[in-house]
C-alpha cells in the first residue's frame, strides 16, 4: 500500500503504518479539546486509540500465525484509520482451513476480552454506569479496563458479520462452498457485504446524533465505500483464480529477448530497459546457470540511488533478486502466481528436465487475465 511506512518487524512480518493514521491522532486532539478535555485527558484519549490499534495488530497476527500453519506467508500487516489488514500470499485451498485462518483474528479479540473481563472482575474495576454520559470518560485511564473489554467484544462481533470483507464473510463462504461451489458462495457473500455497506450508511444517517454527524457521517460513508468495493474485489479474485487454475505455463512461455550477465553494468541494464521490449530480465552466471532476476522497479530504484557517473562502476550482480522456486510447462498459472508472490518477483524461469526453456513474467499474466476476464 502506497503511503505506508514500516514501524516494526515481529516474527519476520513487517508492521506498517499508513500516513493517514497521524491525521487521526490530530483529529483526536482537536475533537478532545473542542469537547472540553484538558491536555492530560487528550493524552489519555490518544493512548486509548493507540491501545485499540494494538488490539487490531494482535487480531491481524492471529490471521498471520494461523495462515503460517498452512504454509501461507504474510507479506506485511498494514494499519490505517479504517483498521488493519494482514496481506497474505494466498489462502488455504480447503474451505475448513480458510475458516480457521479467518476465525483466528476474532478469536484473539475474544481472548483479549476474556483477559480484560477477568481482570476487571477480580479487581472490581469494571464500571458501565458512566459510559456514554460524557466523552471525558475516554480520557480517564480508570475506565480503560471497561473500554478495552467492550472494544474487543465489538471487534470480535463486527468482524464475524457474515459478509465480505469481514472475517465472518470468509467463514460464511467456507460453509457454503462444499455445497454451492467457491464461486457461487463468494457471489452470495459479496452481495451480503455490499448490502451491509449500504445499510451501514442508512443506519448512520438515522442513528448518529446531529452534533457528531459532521465527522462521523463521512467516516461511515468512507467505511461503507471500502466495504462495498472490497466485497466486489473478492469476487473478482475468485474469478481470476478459476481462470489461473484452468490454464498452464505452456500457454504463456516465451523466449527472453535480453538476458543480463551478472557482471553487466547498471548503465547497460538501464539502456536495455529504455528500449521498452521487456521490463523483467533473467541474470546468468558465467557458466550459463541462473544467477537471479532483475526487474524494472529495481533497475530504476538502483539507477536513482546512485550517481549517473557510478552507473558504469556498479554491476548487476550487486542488486539482483535470487530465484528460490522455478516453474515447469505443466504447472498451472495459479501455481506460477503463488510462486511469484511468495518470492516477491516479477519473472520466473521455466525449466523442463533441468533445461531452461523460457520465461513467464507478471506483465504477460496481467495481459492474459485481462483478455480472459473480458471474454467471460
What are these regions (language model features)?
Residues 1-376:
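Hydrophobic transmembrane alpha-helices and their immediate loop junctions
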Amino acid at each position: 500500500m502506497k503511503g505506508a511506512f514500516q514501524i516494526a518487524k515481529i516474527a519476520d512480518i513487517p508492521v506498517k503504518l499508513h500516513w493517514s493514521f497521524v491525521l487521526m491522532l490530530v483529529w483526536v486532539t482537536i475533537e478532545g479539546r473542542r469537547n472540553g478535555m484538558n491536555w492530560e485527558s487528550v493524552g489519555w484519549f490518544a493512548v486509548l486509540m493507540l491501545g485499540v490499534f494494538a488490539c487490531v495488530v494482535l487480531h491481524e497476527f492471529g490471521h498471520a500465525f494461523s495462515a503460517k500453519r498452512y504454509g501461507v506467508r504474510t507479506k506485511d500487516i498494514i494499519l490505517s484509520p479504517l483498521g488493519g489488514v494482514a496481506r497474505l500470499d494466498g489462502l488455504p485451498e480447503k474451505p475448513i482451513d480458510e475458516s480457521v485462518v479467518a476465525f483466528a483474528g476474532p478469536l484473539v479479540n475474544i481472548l483479549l476480552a476474556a483477559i480484560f473481563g477477568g481482570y476487571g472482575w477480580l479487581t472490581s474495576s469494571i464500571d458501565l454506569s458512566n459510559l456514554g454520559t460524557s466523552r471525558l470518560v475516554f480520557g480517564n485511564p480508570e475506565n480503560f479496563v471497561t473500554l478495552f473489554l467492550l472494544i474487543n467484544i465489538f471487534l470480535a462481533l463486527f468482524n464475524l458479520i457474515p459478509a465480505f470483507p469481514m472475517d465472518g464473510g470468509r467463514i460464511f463462504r467456507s460453509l457454503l462452498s462444499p455445497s454451492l461451489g467457491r464461486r457461487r458462495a463468494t457471489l452470495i457473500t459479496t452481495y451480503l457485504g455490499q448490502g451491509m455497506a449500504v445499510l451501514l450508511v442508512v443506519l448512520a444517517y438515522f442513528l448518529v446524533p446531529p452534533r457528531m454527524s459532521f465527522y462521523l457521517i463521512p467516516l461511515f460513508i468512507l467505511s461503507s465505500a471500502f466495504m462495498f468495493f472490497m466485497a466486489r474485489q473478492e469476487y473478482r479474485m475468485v474469478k481470476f483464480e478459476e481462470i489461473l487454475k484452468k490454464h498452464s505455463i505452456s500457454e504463456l512461455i516465451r523466449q527472453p529477448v535480453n538476458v543480463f550477465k551478472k557482471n553487466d553494468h547498471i548503465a547497460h541494464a538501464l539502456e536495455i530497459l529504455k528500449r521498452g521490449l521487456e521490463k523483467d530480465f533473467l541474470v546468468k552466471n558465467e557458466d550459463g546457470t541462473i544467477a537471479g532476476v532483475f526487474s524494472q522497479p529495481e533497475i530504476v530504484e538502483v539507477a536513482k540511488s546512485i550517481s549517473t557517473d557510478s552507473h558504469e562502476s556498479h554491476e548487476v550482480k550487486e542488486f539482483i533478486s535470487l530465484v528460490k522456486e522455478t516453474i515447469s510447462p505443466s504447472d498451472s498459472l495459479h501455481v506460477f502466481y503463488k510462486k511469484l508472490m511468495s518470492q516477491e518477483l516479477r519473472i520466473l524461469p521455466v525449466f523442463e528436465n533441468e533445461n531452461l526453456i523460457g520465461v513467464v513474467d507478471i506483465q504477460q499474466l496481467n495481459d492474459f487475465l485481462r483478455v480472459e476476464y473480458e471474454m467471460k
